[in-house]
Amino acid sequence: LSGKPAKXHLSVGEQAIAMT
């Protein structure tokens, strides 16, 4: 996920984890 956007290629659950 480093250097990549947290949306679009991730599911809602994955986004929440990445945002935490």
Swiss-Prot record:
Subcellular location: Mitochondrion inner membrane
Main location: mitochondrion
GO biological process: oxidative phosphorylation
One GO location term (cellular component): mitochondrial inner membrane
UniProt keyword annotations, A-Z: Membrane, Mitochondrion, Mitochondrion inner membrane
Membrane topology: Single-pass membrane protein
Pathways per UniProt: Energy metabolism; oxidative phosphorylation
Presence of keyword Transmembrane: no
Location of region: Disordered: 1-20
Claim: rRNA-binding is one of the keywords in the record: no
Physiological role: Component of the cytochrome c oxidase, the last enzyme in the mitochondrial electron transport chain which drives oxidative phosphorylation. The respiratory chain contains 3 multisubunit complexes succinate dehydrogenase (complex II, CII), ubiquinol-cytochrome c oxidoreductase (cytochrome b-c1 complex, complex III, CIII) and cytochrome c oxidase (complex IV, CIV), that cooperate to transfer electrons derived from NADH and succinate to molecular oxygen, creating an electrochemical gradient over the inner membrane that drives transmembrane transport and the ATP synthase.
Similarity annotation: Belongs to the cytochrome c oxidase VIII family.
Subunit structure as annotated in this protein's UniProt entry: Component of the cytochrome c oxidase (complex IV, CIV), a multisubunit enzyme composed of 14 subunits. The complex is composed of a catalytic core of 3 subunits MT-CO1, MT-CO2 and MT-CO3, encoded in the mitochondrial DNA, and 11 supernumerary subunits COX4I, COX5A, COX5B, COX6A, COX6B, COX6C, COX7A, COX7B, COX7C, COX8 and NDUFA4, which are encoded in the nuclear genome.
Name assigned to this protein: Cytochrome c oxidase subunit 8B, mitochondrial
Species assigned in the record: Oncorhynchus mykiss (Rainbow trout)
